[in-house]
């Protein structure tokens, strides 16, 4: 009973993060309006599934995974609330500069988390580096009121989300086949 191997919850968290990030950034680059698809993904897959993955990382004793997944899951839930509450008449629309500060704080958090990846897989490093850049650009774009920066950030977000999906599938397939199917740049 004490030797039970626990499943790796990281692919669940990475998929929740990656898919939701791609959908939101398809909006940021101008392909789709901000609608119920993005908001639902933000609540359930980006939010709740990532928090669940983080709690499973806690069970495994992984402080980094716990901190990353529960924090970014909470990010998605707060972002959805920020976007939905004005539509429900609960608050005014968010001030763009204050939204930029919110995103900037997430960028600082992500930069510190990036440093925590430096002994990990190269793809994980890329996910956190590109996410740091994404948050920085979104913060600057909102604070400056510059739609072009937000649009450019959207392209970074698409790359970031795709890299998270690649890492998730790499972890699943590599474990499933017992060999490297998708290289993720594992450190040894």
Swiss-Prot record:
Residue intervals on the Cytoplasmic side: 1-13, 57-63, 119-122, 170-188
Summary of activators and inhibitors of this protein: Transport is inhibited by the protonophore CCCP.
Subcellular location, record wording: Cell inner membrane
GO molecular function per UniProt: acetate:proton symporter activity
GO cellular component, one term: plasma membrane
One Pfam family in the UniProt entry: Gpr1_Fun34_YaaH
pH relationship of activity: Optimum pH is 6.0.
Membrane topology category: Multi-pass membrane protein
Alphabetical UniProt keywords: Cell inner membrane, Cell membrane, Ion transport, Membrane, Symport, Transmembrane, Transmembrane helix, Transport
InterPro entries: Gpr1/Fun34/SatP-like (IPR000791), GPR1_FUN34_YAAH (IPR047622), SatP (IPR047623)
Transmembrane segments: 14-34, 36-56, 64-84, 98-118, 123-143, 149-169
GO BP terms, alphabetized: acetate transmembrane transport; succinate transmembrane transport
Disruption phenotype: Mutant shows a partial reduction in acetate uptake.
Periplasmic membrane side: 35, 85-97, 144-148
Family, similarity comment: Belongs to the acetate uptake transporter (AceTr) (TC 2.A.96) family.
Function: Uptake of acetate and succinate. Transport is energetically dependent on the protonmotive force.
Name by which UniProt lists this protein: Succinate-acetate/proton symporter SatP
């Amino acid at each position: 009973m004490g030797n039970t191997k626990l499943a790796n919850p990281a692919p669940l968290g990475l998929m929740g993060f990656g898919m939701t990030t791609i959908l939101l950034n398809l909006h940021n680059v101008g392909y789709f309006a901000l609608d119920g698809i993005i908001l639902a993904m933000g609540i359930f897959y980006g939010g709740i599934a990532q928090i669940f993955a983080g709690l499973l990382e806690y069970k495994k004793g992984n402080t980094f995974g716990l901190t990353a997944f529960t924090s970014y899951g909470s990010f998605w839930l707060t972002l959805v609330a920020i976007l939905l509450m004005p539509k429900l008449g609960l608050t005014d629309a968010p001030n763009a500069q204050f939204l930029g500060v919110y995103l900037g704080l997430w960028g600082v958090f992500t930069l510190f988390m990036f440093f925590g990846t430096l002994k990990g897989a190269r793809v994980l490093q890329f996910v956190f580096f590109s996410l740091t850049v994404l948050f920085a650009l979104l913060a600057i774009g909102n604070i400056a009121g510059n739609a072009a920066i937000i649009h450019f950030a959207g392209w970074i977000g698409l790359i970031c989300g795709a890299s998270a999906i690649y890492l998730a599938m790499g972890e699943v397939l590599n474990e499933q086949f017992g060999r490297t199917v998708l290289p993720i740049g594992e450190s040894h």
